[in-house]
């Protein structure tokens, strides 16, 4: 035997019917589906006001409340239709009514605003609601968002920015509203419909019902967001397309005209460096000029007399200016190694046959102070050290700034003449 349920007092039903049902046009009152929508409004009013102000009234759902109204006003069903059947038809019809709302994003585009229904088992979803007769979609979205959050999106809404899905044969369109300050105060305008309003990080929301991201990061099961789940992945895709969250841009959600982020600058620097390497593969333009100048200098010594004069001048310079040369060359070892490591661009075929000679360019002797590599025929030139005293040179002198490759090298004038074909 079923326990007897508490009944809604007749006076309460009279007041509710006069407020929401009896005053509607006759053509709507004769339509049971339209009457059910008005009964739904009466049910919300009963929960918001009568239940709050009159203790002892029974708590009832929409089906029990609709049965009580139809029983109290039998003229609403003149043909004696089955109430359960009418309610099923009304529920099916409701699923076909489009719903419109908004996805509200903060200024960082990383957080989204969700609302929670009043009932204890209600989950989190986007503010939205069913469209009224002859109501424009964007007007419906603005109205529903204002009723559920107290925030007016009319100044933010763009009619072309929305995500539209069909869920269980019901059309749902949510307009995307970016750039709402996170410190905005939200206050629902309807009673007993919205319990909580909170910001949630988009990356912590689930994309499907088995996504356990909110469980690990928010401590909430994914089914708590079942009304929002269908929109999360399309929202991420929309943000990626609109604000360029791709590897090509390197600047997150920055706009097209903003300053490139550091990775972009570094990428440009690396590109310029690679380009310079292609233009000057063997070094800087100055290095190229020096290397080009060296063979020209080598060709300039055209006869034996000029070579002898140059060698004598070299001897005199080393006697008088040894100290200055060492002081003016702070990086002698590095410089000497660099010069020695440069290959000769033009070699006489005789060099290939006489591998033991390994001739050295004349300008190397003049440009480096690495060794005393002058011929010692007839006289022994004296070279001045940094300390000021002279030392006799026999062709095998060693100085602190000498190159290892030429410490034991003896200058052979005859070999040089052969190489120059003089």
Curated annotation (Swiss-Prot):
Tissue expression as described in the entry: Strongly expressed in brain and testis. Weakly expressed in lung. Not detected in heart, liver, kidney and muscle (at protein level).
Sorted UniProt keywords: Cytoplasm, Hydrolase, Manganese, Metal-binding, Nonsense-mediated mRNA decay, Nucleus, Phosphoprotein, RNA-binding
Q: In what ranges is there compositional bias, type Low complexity?
A: 249-258
Entry-linked SMART domains: DCP2
Q: State the compartments where it is located.
A: Cytoplasm, P-body; Nucleus
Q: Which residues bind Mn(2+)?
A: 144, 148
Kindly list the cofactors needed.
Mn(2+); Mg(2+)
Q: Where is this motif: Nudix box?
A: 129-150
Record note on cofactor: Mn(2+) ion is required for highest activity. Can also utilize magnesium ions.
Q: Which PROSITE patterns match?
A: NUDIX, NUDIX_BOX
Reactions it catalyzes: a 5'-end (N(7)-methyl 5'-triphosphoguanosine)-ribonucleoside in mRNA + H2O = N(7)-methyl-GDP + a 5'-end phospho-ribonucleoside in mRNA + 2 H(+)
Q: Where is the Nudix hydrolase domain?
A: 95-226
The annotated regions of Basic and acidic residues compositional bias extend over 303-312
Using the record's annotations, give every residue carrying the modification Phosphoserine: 246-247, 249, 276, 284
Q: Which Pfam families match?
A: DCP2, NUDIX
GO MF annotations, alphabetized: 5'-(N(7)-methylguanosine 5'-triphospho)-[mRNA] hydrolase activity; 5'-3' RNA exonuclease activity; manganese ion binding; telomerase RNA binding
User: Which EC number applies?
Assistant: 3.6.1.62
Q: Give a short account of what the protein does.
A: Decapping metalloenzyme that catalyzes the cleavage of the cap structure on mRNAs. Removes the 7-methyl guanine cap structure from mRNA molecules, yielding a 5'-phosphorylated mRNA fragment and 7m-GDP. Necessary for the degradation of mRNAs, both in normal mRNA turnover and in nonsense-mediated mRNA decay. Plays a role in replication-dependent histone mRNA degradation. Has higher activity towards mRNAs that lack a poly(A) tail. Has no activity towards a cap structure lacking an RNA moiety.
What family, per the record?
A: Belongs to the Nudix hydrolase family. DCP2 subfamily.
Q: What is this protein called?
A: m7GpppN-mRNA hydrolase
List the source organism. Answer: Mus musculus
